[in-house]
């Protein structure tokens, strides 16, 4: 069953983790796929993994100019866009006292400002119907120390799904947000922790999850396929929490 047959799609941050898993699933479901990333080496590895039919775009997720260039490249390659998964982001965790203005601006640029201006640039390409899928987080609903800037950006994405839907649904464009809990992806390796700290953190996180484990990138990707498909046409401005029950604690 090809639920995304011939749909033109974009996945930002598509070189690893949830983004790469979603690109695989989109291809399996018959979609035409473009992905973005910042690291040239990982972009090339993704090309090898996904195949030469995938459009690979190098782009800084926090740059407004880069988002506009993504739209230009997609317009030239696809002419239209049926679904976009705005997945690129960073997780910068630190105590309140350790935040500088520069660090704050960079984190918000990648996790909120860039996505906002990407959607703005893509709207002229979006079909009727079309699906915008934003990346939120269970952290937006929790008061976890050190997640200040990440959580506020993700709360912004949850709100953005609603306001975009309010403005665009008349054109057949729906926006929803998927909010994962702790997922076992390479992003966890970018926190700068040593092996012992990483293990201790993982154990602490799992202790907060009623399901008793990390989620997988594939579990999130399966949900994104649903949100991108025509099965989801009556779901508008909603949030899908996939967190092993973490939000109920």
What are these regions (language model features)?
Residues 95-96, 103-108, 205:
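Substrate-binding pocket helix/loop in short-chain dehydrogenase/reductase
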